[in-house]
């Protein structure tokens, strides 16, 4: 349970900030103790498994828990299954199969051939986390989040009030901005609101999506 909680924390940290790669969390457990952890780096490289295993620890016989099936293909870096074998990991557990056709259902076969037990452990409460990644891989389209604020009388603005959202909804919007690559807005909306359309949350203010004005 502790490993699941730790891996869940790691996967969330860089959500929306790993470019084309999904945000993944990985923890290494040996003798019932978490000895290392990793997450996908900003811009997507290195992967979480590599970041967890690059530290100078004795990983022989350890269990690796990760949120997504380890990659099996060569890209800008070697596949994660290679370093898993090199570090002599005993068991690999992952929450979802990677829909990327270069990896889909291949990690288990490769690792099992190397006598590394690999198991898919489905975690339903993680599923929505990868909605954007799964959607992109399935339809080859970007995942779109819509922000709409409407008053009780079904108007978005009136002459008396400039904003109809509250502090909590504004925080949610800023968080969405930090997780998305770009924002589409109309020139009318920007001119009326004088919108900055950036993220103004502490620690996330460096993550500003590209702006496209319609």
Q: PLM features: what roles do these ranges have?
A:
Residues 1-17, 31, 60, 74-214:
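Zinc-dependent deaminase
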Residues 17-27, 61-62:
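Acidic, glycine-enriched active-site microenvironments
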Residues 19-21, 47, 206:
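A generic fold-level signal
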Residues 22-24, 35, 144-146:
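Short loop/turn microsegments at loop-to-beta-strand junctions
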Residues 24, 39, 46-47, 64-83:
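Local cysteine-cluster metal-coordination motifs and their immediate loop/turn environment
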Residues 25-27, 38-39, 69, 149, ...:
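Anionic group-transfer/hydrolysis microenvironments
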Residues 26-30, 34-54, 122:
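N-terminal beta-alpha supersecondary unit
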């Amino acid at each position: 349970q502790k490993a699941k909680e730790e891996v869940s924390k790691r996967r969330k940290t860089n959500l929306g900030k790993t470019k084309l790669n999904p945000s993944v969390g990985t923890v290494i457990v040996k003798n019932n103790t978490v000895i290392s952890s990793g997450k996908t780096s900003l811009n997507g490289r290195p992967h979480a498994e590599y970041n967890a295993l690059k530290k100078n620890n004795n990983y022989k016989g350890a269990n690796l828990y990760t949120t997504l099936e380890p990659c099996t293909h060569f890209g800008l870096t070697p596949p994660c299954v290679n370093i898993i074998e090199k570090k002599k990991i005993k068991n690999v557990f992952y929450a979802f199969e990677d829909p990327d056709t270069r990896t889909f259902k291949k990690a288990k076969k490769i690792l099992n051939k190397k006598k590394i037990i690999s198991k898919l452990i489905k975690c339903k409460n993680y599923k929505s986390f990868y909605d954007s990644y799964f959607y992109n891989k399935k339809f080859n389209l970007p995942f779109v989040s819509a922000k709409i604020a409407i008053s009780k009388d079904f108007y978005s603005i009136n002459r008396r009030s400039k904003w109809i959202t509250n502090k909590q909804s504004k925080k949610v919007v800023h968080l969405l901005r930090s997780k998305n690559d770009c924002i589409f807005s109309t020139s009318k909306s920007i001119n009326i609101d004088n919108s900055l359309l950036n993220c103004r949350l502490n620690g996330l203010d460096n993550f500003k999506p590209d702006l496209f004005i319609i």
